[in-house]
Design a protein with these regions (language model features):
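A short, Lys/Arg-rich alpha-helix, primarily the initiator
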Residues: 21-57
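Flexible helix-coil transition and linker loops at the boundaries of alpha-helical arrays
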Residues: 105-106, 140-150, 181-197, 230-238
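Short alpha-helical DNA-recognition segment
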Residues: 56-76
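Short, charged recognition helix plus adjacent turn
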Residues: 36, 105-131
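Helix-turn-helix repeat elements of alpha-solenoid scaffolds
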Residues: 124-138, 165-186, 214-226, 255
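DNA major-groove recognition helix of helix-turn-helix/homeodomain DNA-binding modules
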Residues: 85-103
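Tandem amphipathic alpha-helical repeat scaffolds
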Residues: 115-126, 152-167, 199-215, 243-254
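Alpha-helical residues within helix-turn-helix
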Residues: 52, 62-63, 91
């Protein structure tokens, strides 16, 4: 019941996040700016790479974009009336276990500034949590209608900042809410049937950690092993697996 409540609460915010993403990357008044034309050109090149890899691996497009992009937004991109953000394209490639380090991308100034703001928050979480909290709150205030990927980031940071003070139940609910930002399918059982990026698996690791704090050791270990074995089952590239190993090892030590 508690899990369904958390899922329902998260789903009520999904439409506004989807709308935020659509409004961000669709031409205003039907006329792209010069910057948008450059981003769109880069995006279509990435979309072809993404589509070719997806077809090689026999993955349905709807499966990969579920929870990240609406059908309407996907249709808009295919028609050439909008474009992938770098974050979105990278997220979807990561769901296939494919690195994106090999490709250069053109990103908008706004997206670059957004990335820098998040990087600043990450650098402060461990060494200066109070300052990280201040920057996180400022970021959330500046982005009232953020995308599902941005919300996933914020909730994971929130969990880390509350780890020492919040109750295990609060941490569990927070971690579940983070997962539900982008994962719409059932995920507390077998993960092998889902297409998940490292960012999503990190959130599931936080759920596992929270379950351990709640004394639900068996459930915690089950979920942990699902995440630990996921890259191998999905045939991830070695360097992709390295993006997840340190976090998984840390949670494993806590359990």
């Amino acid at each position: 019941k508690e899990k369904n409540k958390i899922k329902a609460q998260t789903e009520t915010q999904t439409e506004s996040r989807a709308e935020a993403q659509e409004n961000e990357y669709v031409w205003k008044n039907g006329h792209p700016t010069e910057e948008e034309v450059l981003c769109q050109s880069s995006c279509m090149g990435f979309f072809r790479l993404f589509n070719n890899l997806r077809k090689q691996r026999g993955i349905k497009l709807e499966q990969l974009v579920n929870g990240v992009m609406t059908r309407r937004m996907l249709s808009t991109i295919i028609k050439g009336d909008g474009y992938f953000s770098r974050e979105c394209w990278e997220f979807l490639m990561h769901r296939m276990g494919a690195l994106t380090d090999y490709f250069e991308a053109i990103v908008s100034r706004k997206e670059l500034e957004d990335w820098r703001e998040r990087e600043d928050i990450c650098l402060l979480v461990c060494e200066s949590p109070k300052e990280a909290r201040t920057k996180l709150e400022a970021y959330e205030k500046a982005h009232p209608k953020m995308t599902s990927m941005a919300k996933l980031f914020c909730l994971k940071i929130e969990w880390l900042l509350k780890k020492e003070t919040a109750s295990p139940q609060v941490l569990y609910e927070l971690a579940c809410e983070a997962v539900y930002c982008t994962v719409k399918e059932e995920w507390q059982g077998q993960l092998s049937g889902l297409w998940l990026a490292p960012a999503e698996l990190e959130a599931i690791l936080l759920v596992s950690w929270s379950l351990g704090l709640l004394g639900e050791t068996e459930k915690a270990l089950f979920l942990f092993h699902q995440v630990w074995n996921y890259p191998k089952k999905k045939g991830w590239e070695d360097r992709m697996t390295q993006l997840l190993c340190p976090q998984a090892a840390l949670v494993g030590m806590q359990l």
